[in-house]
Amino acid sequence: MRDVSLNPVRPLVTDLTNLTELAWLDDRAIAPALVTLTSGATRVVVAPEVGGALAAYYESTPEGALHWLRPATQAAFDERDPLRMASFPLFPYCNRIRDARFEFGGGTVDLSGNDLRFAHALHGNAWRHPWQVGACTESSVELHFEHTPDPQQPGDWPFRYRAQQRIELVGGALHVALSAQNLGDRPMPFGMGHHPYYPRTAQTRVYANVQRMWHADADVLPTHLGPHPAVEALRHGMSPDAFALDNNFANWSREATIAWPDEHRQLTMTADTPFDHLVVFAPANDAQLCVEPVTNTTDCFNAVDMQEQVGGCVLEPGEEIAATLTWTPRKG
């Protein structure tokens, strides 16, 4: 059952036909139930049923929607695909786990079989399920997801936990507070993050103060931490076309800026600890660009002897963790 507790002036909507605010979609579009947050001219469209994802974050202007994140397409709604939303939450780990298995608590955690599209477990399980809607105002909404292991489902995450997002507009800035609690009676390995996609143009630049990069193999799994020309490029404003990247970066300052200098605007993302790791996904000859704040590197659960370098943590029974991400736009 979905728990819907909404301000009447901000109802969940399913028929987008008359919503001119969502004009980037076809005027005949039908989407899952959405929540639209407003603050002045800024809008955030949330798709609870599509993995608790953000569908869009934009400013409404006389010329149309000015998007700060890549907006979801109609196909993303049709297929309920979080991977094609504007951003989606990552619980209870970020990125890949090699061969979908790792050792923990004296046994093997086998996550294989839950998604045959991927050879390695990917992004946890919260993005694969609908989220419940909690308290909602004109400018904020709370989303909740609770996972109980299903022994009959191959590759199901074998630990019980609760996750929450509080998504809020403050002025033009977007705040996403993420939290989780171990609801089980045994320790649980854990990590979290968000997976934002940004508009990518020929003039886009990414700024981030990072120290080293995790080099990766053909399966995009980390092999070693070391120098790379992208480290220096990010400090001075890296073009997404400069390298073919799908890599973790270490020791970032928890601040990154995506700039569109030809459009005279930029978006700065800041993160609380323990979002101490940064992923940059900028594939060659592709329109995608992600700059992702995460608490753990790829395959961290299989690198138990490198905890300080790979992040992640273990939540004891009943233990909670919380941290906030903020995106602040600027024009001019």
Where are these regions (language model features)?
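Hydrophobic residues embedded in beta-strands of well-ordered beta-sheets
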Residues: 35, 44, 141, 174-176, ...
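Active-site/ligand-binding surface loops and adjacent short beta/alpha elements
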Residues: 9-12, 16, 187-189, 196-273
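Extended, loop-rich substrate-binding clefts of extracytoplasmic carbohydrate-active enzymes
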Residues: 24-25, 29, 38, 103, ...
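Beta-strand-rich N-terminal accessory domains
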Residues: 4-116, 254-275, 319-330
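Acidic, contiguous internal or C-terminal segments within carbohydrate-active enzymes
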Residues: 37, 44, 48, 147-190, ...
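Glycine-rich, pocket-lining loop/helix-strand segments that form or immediately flank
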Residues: 66-84, 109-130, 207-229, 288, ...
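Intrinsically disordered, low-complexity Pro/Gly/Ser/Thr-rich segments with frequent PxxP/GP/PP motifs
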Residues: 310-321
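Acidic/His-leaning functional-site neighborhoods
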Residues: 42, 120-134, 205-206, 234-311
